[in-house]
A protein has these predicted regions:
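Periplasmic/cell-envelope proteins involved in peptidoglycan metabolism and beta-lactam response
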Residues: 1-296, 318, 338-340, 346, ...
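Beta-lactam-recognizing serine transpeptidase/beta-lactamase-like catalytic domain environment
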Residues: 2-8, 77, 221-232, 272-323, ...
Length: 588
């Protein structure tokens, strides 16, 4: 082959390669141009918004929660400034390093800070995470001074719930806490790690009114997350509504001091209006522990307490009412014609019933002798009411107990109020598939056996009795609207007889609460001692176990006065306090 021919062939191969290479280059540039067109034109608005999102921040202005007052304007729950240590992940290039710096500089446990981050994994990257809810002032000022060293971390002053009376009325007032577990159920724009809601008591019941409306502003921020300028017109937050209670914190304090550290409940009401003037449950707790999220140590301590400090025993505690229930049995006996005011029974200390070998005993060894209705109420004679209860039967007892408001919630509005239990023959057949036995009625007649009530139900019953059968619904709020008083179909003459017996309890010789009579006005009252275990079980215990406090009876006392025109009613329950006249009556 000639040399010229070889040169032409080589040039052709080079030319082909250049054409291919040029095509590839053109293809690449075409793809790049197409992508640039897509990014700048088709998706331009989207990425412009992304870019602006890196420098424009929506800064929330939390609404101030409504203040809770007592009936005299004393503040029970308010707001105070708290220095929140917040972190925005979007503004934190090296999260772990920043957390380490914060931990070291402010002497905060790294593990706890990291746990806060993990717990907020569902929160949007641009939303703040609260690392510390209420940082000490000195630490807050240090971080403010050296903020450049902590990218994405800032100090934000936020309102924090504060309870100036600490433990006083804690169960009634309730407490607030941070919402975290319900984030996924909220729209993205409403998710916030600082959302505060009521968790119990009035704080929960009135949460929708007290929470207010958050405001906010759009602000331009620098690369450190610091505000440069406000964009547009800020939206002001709207404070929540204030709440005024019927509670008198002075009475609440007196009730707390009177209990002297015992476990139980105290309630003070106005029977004419239904106003709750005091409601105390013991042991109590400090609601301030929950304002910024309770720590694990305090939470475990509250849960481990065998006396259940988080339970509002006034509405959630279920107890046999004991001898206070005798007012129901007395009314049932009068209404059913089983007894009259003059009916007398002989109490020799025990009562036999057919088919049962062991007698039902009276609390007074040797008995009360011959007693009529007034005497039986005054001395709390079990035998008199055993007879009366068996005479009317369990279903009549059930009927009149319901009329007095037992066996159903009072409707006070507080969460988890218990209804208690007033048994009937139908109830036992439904639950146990057994008939009601006559031998079960004596226990029911004196408020034992299956019967359980809450302290609020018991004082509600006494208010109906004191108020001539007019039921005033329990009222928590000052000037509360929508309450519907109800005249219960009870005969005045029977109610008057029972009130006479209750006056004798406090003011006559032989009365079970003679030691607590008042000089200022005449008081009507009733003591009660309710068993926590049966006599049969008690007999199986040794002396040391019998002496244990957990096996001691509960002590009740309820009173109203002045007896002829009641303006106040008081109930005291002392758990495992022993006799009502010894433990509960002195509280009142």
């Amino acid at each position: 082959m000639k040399p010229d021919t070889l040169e032409f062939e080589e040039l052709d191969r080079i030319r082909i390669r250049l054409i291919i290479l040029g095509g590839v280059v053109i293809l690449i540039f075409s793809l790049l141009a197409s992508r640039l067109w897509y990014l700048q034109i088709t998706e331009g608005q989207k990425y412009t918004e992304f870019s602006q999102g890196n420098r424009i921040r929506l800064v929330a202005e939390p609404a101030l929660r409504g203040i809770i007052y007592d009936r005299n304007g004393v503040i029970l729950a308010e707001n105070r400034p708290a220095y929140q240590l917040q972190l925005i992940r979007e503004d934190t290039p090296d999260l772990e390093s920043t957390l380490g710096q914060v931990s070291q500089a402010l002497n905060l446990p790294f593990a706890e800070l990291n746990e806060k981050i993990k717990a907020s994994h569902d929160l949007a990257q641009f939303k703040p995470i609260i690392l510390v809810d209420d940082l000490e002032y000195e630490k807050a000022m240090y971080l403010e001074t050296f903020q450049d060293d902590f990218p994405g971390v800032s100090i934000v002053v936020q309102p924090r719930r504060f309870y100036p009376k600490n433990n006083l009325a804690a169960h009634l007032i309730g407490y607030v806490g941070i919402v975290q577990e319900d984030w996924k159920e909220l729209p993205e724009e409403k998710r916030s790690s600082s959302q505060i809601v009521g968790h119990s008591g009035i704080e929960l019941l009135e949460n929708d009114y007290m929470i207010g409306l958050d405001g906010g502003r759009q602000a331009e921020v620098d690369h450190m997350g610091r505000e440069i300028q406000v964009l547009g017109k800020p939206v002001a937050s709207v404070p929540g509504e204030d709440i005024s209670l019927n509670l008198d914190i002075r009475l609440q304090k007196v009730a707390t001091e009177a209990m002297q550290g015992e476990s139980g409940a105290v309630i003070v009401m106005n029977p004419k209006t239904g106003e709750i003037l005091a409601m105390a449950s013991f042991p109590d707790f400090d609601p301030n522990l929950f304002s910024g999220g309770i720590d694990q140590k305090n939470w475990n301590r509250l849960l481990a307490n065998p006396e259940h400090p988080l339970e509002n025993k006034a509405i959630q505690g279920l107890y046999a009412p004991g001898s206070i229930f005798k007012v129901v049995t007395a009314y049932a006996g009068l209404a059913q014609g089983v007894i009259t005011p003059q009916t007398e029974r002989v109490c020799n200390g025990y009562y036999f019933i057919k088919g049962r070998s062991a007698p039902f005993k009276c609390w007074k060894e040797g008995g009360h002798g011959k007693v009529n209705l007034i005497d039986a109420i005054k001395g709390s004679c079990n035998v008199y009411f055993y007879n009366t209860g068996v005479g009317v039967g369990v279903d009549a007892i059930h009927k009149y107990a319901n009329l007095f408001g037992l066996g159903k919630i009072t409707g006070v509005g507080l969460q988890n109020e218990k209804a208690g239990l007033i048994p009937s023959s139908k109830w036992k057949k439904r639950i146990f598939k057994e008939p009601w036995y006559r031998g079960e009625t004596p226990s029911a007649a004196i408020g034992q056996g299956y019967i359980t009530t809450t302290p609020l139900q018991v004082i509600n019953m006494i208010n109906i009795l004191a108020n001539d059968g007019l039921w005033m619904p329990p009222s928590l709020f000052k000037d509360q609207q929508g309450l519907q008083p109800q005249q219960i179909p009870l005969k005045d003459e029977y109610l008057s007889l029972i009130r006479e017996g209750m006056v004798a309890v406090v003011n006559s010789e032989g009365g079970t609460a003679k030691k607590v009579q008042f000089e200022e006005f005449t008081v009507a009252g009733k003591t009660a001692t309710s068993q926590v275990i049966s006599n049969k079980t008690l007999e199986t215990l040794d002396d040391e176990a019998k002496a244990s406090k957990i096996f001691q009876n509960h002590a009740w006392f309820v009173a109203f006065g002045p007896a002829e025109d009641p303006e106040i009613s008081v109930l005291a329950l002392v758990e495992h306090g022993g006799g009502g006249s010894k433990a509960a009556a002195p509280v009142v």
